[in-house]
Curated annotation (Swiss-Prot):
Spans through the membrane: none
Pfam families: B12D
A GO cellular-component term linked to this record: nucleus
Signal peptide annotation: none
Lineage start: Eukaryota, Metazoa, Chordata, Craniata, Vertebrata
Domain of life assignment: Eukaryota
Intracellular or extracellular location(s): Nucleus
Claim: Nucleus is one of the keywords in the record: yes
Key words of the record: Nucleus
Matches recorded under InterPro entries: B12D
GO biological process, one term: response to bacterium
Family of this protein: Belongs to the complex I NDUFA4 subunit family.
Principal location: nucleus
Stated name of the protein: Normal mucosa of esophagus-specific gene 1 protein
Amino acid sequence: MGIFQRLMKNKELIPLAFFISAAATGASSFALYALKKTDVVIDRKRNPEPWETVDPTQPQKLLTINQEWKPVEELQRVRRATR
């Protein structure tokens, strides 16, 4: 007996199947979204410090209000001196 036949036979299972499917889809979507973020390090051998290559002018959040980025001159001098 297939899953659709079982759902049509027991109609009370339809909402349960819907909510379980929606929860699984949401969890999978969030996991993929979280793995694409720049603060997640999966391979430390090839790129040990991925946060150094993040573009500061590009917002990292879903919603950013009035973000302006200006480089801190002292920090830039320290970065150039340590390289």
